[in-house]
Amino acid sequence: MKKIFTKTMFICGMMALSFSASNSFAQEANANQEQESAAAKNLVKWNVAAIALKTYSFQYERAVGKRMSVSLGFRMMPKSHVPFSSTFKSLIDDDQTWESIKDFKTGNFAITPEFRYYVGQSVFRGFYVAPFVRYSRYNVALPYNYEATFGTTTVKDRIDMDGNISTLTTGLLLGAQWKLSKAIYLDWWILGPNYGSASGSISGKKNLSNEEQQALREALTDLDDLPLVKTKSTVDANGAKIDFSGPWAGLRSGLSFGYRF
């Protein structure tokens, strides 16, 4: 009986030691993993949803506190026709205006500094609010088709115009970020409205007669129907210039995959 009791005590002791060692190892592994994560203060991200808009969008984020981070975003779109041009067309309630600008092309780049506050337990995870500033520069190419009738004479022609428009906006982004694996993260920009101002100009060189100048001058008044921006046009014998100014509004949204290091 004594031998059985001793053997039982020995087995229980070994099991207790084994459990204690396993638990200690697991705690040590978790602690090491947490220390590794705490030491990895950087995230680089690629906004894959932006591809649908013919745009390449990247962001670098760095932790600066338990629930806070700062980031810098960069966006670039090569010059091309406007994405979802049918939607853009529906915003212009005038067929003649659309015919004049349907060959419009644009490219752009933007830089976006941002501050994030995570409302959960730690930085890089959970829901967040992020005030931001965005500077954008749009490169515009506009082959402008125009026509005008004077008595029995109809003037039809085209002038190729190009130039740049710069915008500066501020806004607030609401989003959420999840840890998918040890170093891979998913960042969802849920909604980021922003508002500010725009300014710039486009111009084209072309020798114009008095009739052609008048025809182009009248046709350019159609640009008053463009959404968001105000336009002012100048026409002379050497060509035309259009100045853009006024308010500018935008909306940030996206889905990014990130790597933490």
For the regions a protein language model found, what residue spans apply to each?
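Outer-membrane beta-barrel channels and translocator barrels
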Residues: G65-R67, M77, G120-F124, K179-S181
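Transmembrane beta-strand segments that form the barrel wall of outer-membrane beta-barrel proteins
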Residues: A38-Y56, S69-M77
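Short N-terminal edge-element motif at the start of the domain
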Residues: S71, R75, Q96-G107, E114, ...
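Residue-level detector of the transmembrane beta-barrel scaffold of outer-membrane proteins
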Residues: L43-K45, S69-S71, Y128-A130, Y185-D187, ...
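Residues on the lipid-exposed face of transmembrane beta-strands in outer-membrane beta-barrel proteins
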Residues: F58-R62, I111-Y117, P131-Y135, T170-W178, ...
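Cleavable N-terminal export/targeting peptides
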Residues: M1-S37, Q214-K232
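Ordered, amphipathic secondary-structure segments that act as subunit-interaction surfaces
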Residues: Q121-A141
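Extracellular/periplasm-exposed beta-strand and loop segments of Gram-negative cell-envelope proteins
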Residues: Q35, K45-A49, K79-A110, S136-T167, ...
